[in-house]
């Protein structure tokens, strides 16, 4: 999560590099693939707060899969400005759609519609729960940003960028497509699951009877040097309750962020690491009958599934 915050604020600047400035051709676009309830909406609001405070004149649009989703990020932002140290920076009272600072910085909630998106020319668009977006709307968002001259640790200008935040749960869905297309030169991907944002595991909680031990393997207790008062986004007790309510596939998809949920696919047990093999080398073919099934690929590439039935009847 902190890597996302650093990227959102410093944009393409890499402080682990000896270079004095970021490469000019790098993009600030990024994708956040994170578990449900793991703080991605709050962190996007926090990134928006930092931009508003330290990048005078910046224009930011908050766009959700629904207007209600957009307002959730806006509500986080409103609560952050309740701080006595920040409230005097406001140029006007925060409305249900807009935050305006005396510096000229503005953050505004957008309705998830073509009309509102196409009329925008801003520095940053933060798209929450992009899995729920219509594809045409997502395409329209890509043409809404522009850079702004402003010297800072991010370089000599603030880069126009689009951020996509969501849980990836639909195979072949929009978020899956965005992640697949996100080569290093186009978008940086940040991914975290429930184990990355758990609150400290109390000593009274035993691993032997813990329903999430198969995933955790005791690592939370081993790594946790935080004080007991530290806060995560999800408590151990809540994580245990959530795990007890769902099947393994849903847990891996929506909470561990390992892969999309395949429960509605034809072959949910298919695993590329196991079932995708190189073409056989020349030589006598193994005995048995061969079968081939073809998917012409409405969403992805066409694929052929090969199977052999040996003389024992094993497929």
For each feature predicted by the language model, list its residue ranges.
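Conserved pre-motif I regulatory segment
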Residues: 1-30
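Walker A/P-loop
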Residues: 25-47
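Conserved Walker A/P-loop ATP-binding site and its immediately adjacent core
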Residues: 58-77
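Inter-Walker segment of RecA-like/P-loop motor cores
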Residues: 75-123
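ASCE P-loop NTPase helicase motor core
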Residues: 81-84, 88-89, 132-238
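Nucleic-acid-processing active sites and adjacent nucleic-acid-binding tracks
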Residues: 101-102, 286, 305-315
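Walker B catalytic acidic pair
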Residues: 128-129
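ATPase catalytic-site recognition across NTP-hydrolyzing enzymes
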Residues: 201-294
């Amino acid at each position: 999560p902190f890597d996302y915050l650093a990227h959102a604020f410093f944009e393409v600047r890499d402080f682990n590099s000896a270079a004095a400035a970021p490469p000019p051709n790098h993009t600030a676009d990024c994708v956040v693939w994170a578990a449900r309830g793991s703080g991605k909406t709050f962190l996007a609001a926090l990134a928006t707060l930092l931009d508003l405070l330290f990048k005078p004149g910046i224009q930011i649009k908050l766009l959700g899969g629904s207007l209600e989703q957009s307002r959730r990020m806006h509500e986080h932002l409103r609560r952050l400005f309740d701080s006595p140290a920040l409230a005097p920076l406001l140029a006007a009272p925060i409305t249900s759609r807009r935050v305006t600072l005396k510096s000229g910085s503005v953050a505004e909630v957008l309705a998830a519609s073509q009309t509102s998106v196409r009329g925008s020319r801003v520095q940053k668009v933060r798209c929450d729960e992009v899995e729920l977006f219509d594809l045409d709307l997502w395409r329209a968002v890509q043409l809404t940003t522009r850079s702004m001259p402003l010297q800072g640790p991010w370089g000599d200008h603030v880069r126009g960028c689009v951020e996509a935040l969501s849980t990836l749960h639909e195979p072949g869905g929009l978020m899956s497509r965005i992640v697949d297309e996100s080569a290093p030169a186009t978008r940086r991907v940040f991914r975290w699951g429930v184990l990355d944002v758990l609150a400290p595991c109390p000593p009274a909680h035993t691993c032997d009877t813990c329903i999430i031990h198969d995933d955790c393997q005791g690592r939370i207790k081993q790594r946790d040097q935080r004080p007991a008062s530290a806060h995560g986004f999800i408590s151990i007790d809540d994580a245990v309750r959530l795990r007890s309510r769902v099947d393994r596939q849903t847990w891996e998809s929506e909470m561990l962020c390992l892969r999309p949920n395949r429960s509605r696919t034809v072959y949910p047990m298919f695993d590329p690491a196991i079932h995708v093999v190189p073409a056989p080398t020349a030589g006598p073919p193994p005995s048995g009958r061969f079968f081939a099934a073809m998917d012409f690929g409405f969403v992805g590439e066409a694929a052929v599934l090969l199977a052999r039935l040996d003389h024992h009847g094993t497929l």
